[in-house]
């Protein structure tokens, strides 16, 4: 399989979690492209410098059951949301809720899901990318769908440390009307009578808000 588009190197590999019968794969492959003897090798290279580019893994939000990702269809990850916005995505770029196909009136981004936490399954450090792509997604949403959709980002700290990142943040607030709330939401629940999501969080002065 090709694990993801634009993989480097651009080569197919065997997904051992799905198929471990190598002999059967060799038998049915029409191009005779599977070579069982072509296994992992260790080589020693003499180089002048080393660049560390370990990549990253996606976090599974189901670890945090209070957000009910995987239970409530309208709770999605940023990657899921990018697919919704994409012209080649499941809704062909239309902003539609997975649960009922209707257009949402409010969208909330919850930052630091999986990072900067002490619970089991989380990491203690900042992912360093989420603030900027959340701002980008919120701005794209406001730009494409205008005043029809309210965009709110719930954050711990807006880490806009790169070149012109702070300017980008100011544009999101002042030009696009993106709302920023400094709070880490506690739970996401669904109102049974309406099917709408209800997000519970503490305001900056310690009050509970919905």
Label each region the model flagged.
Residues 47, 162-164, 189-195:
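Short, solvent-exposed polar/charged micro-motifs at secondary-structure junctions
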Residues 58, 66, 176-210:
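Phosphate/diphosphate-binding loops
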Residues 164-175:
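Short, aromatic/basic amphipathic alpha-helical patches
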